[in-house]
């Protein structure tokens, strides 16, 4: 099961517009990837043990590195570029140039493949949000 949306953002989906920067990487101007990486971290921090933008690996306009520890205690170094996110190492701040892993368009898709506990946390957050919307609708 791929989860390509953040349950915390469901209430803002009505503001979704064609061509918006929120639609992903295609068709947008070059971004500062460090800022993009910070946004990625803030989106999914609730569903992992630890996640932060690397301070020791070079960030630039076109690339940033994110360290993540899943709830299963597996550590990864992720590369964020205009192409998306991919695993580049199996430890914090580690880049293995020989590692061949696929790019994922979203952090949700990437974590969905790496962490069953992420899927569970995402599903629980989604359920809580839907229950809150239901309660608000009944008031």
Curated annotation (Swiss-Prot):
Residues 1-22 are annotated as: Disordered. This is GSK3B-interacting protein. Changing residue 109 to A: No effect on GSK3B-mediated phosphorylation. Reduces to 30 % GSK3B-mediated phosphorylation. Reduces to 30 % GSK3B-mediated phosphorylation. InterPro entries: GSKIP, GSKIP_dom, GSKIP_dom_sf. GO terms for biological process: intrinsic apoptotic signaling pathway in response to oxidative stress; negative regulation of protein kinase activity; positive regulation of canonical Wnt signaling pathway; regulation of Wnt signaling pathway. Belongs to the GSKIP family. Detected in heart, brain, placenta, liver, skeletal muscle, kidney, testis, lung and pancreas. It comes from Homo sapiens (Human). One of its GO terms (cellular component) is cytoplasm.
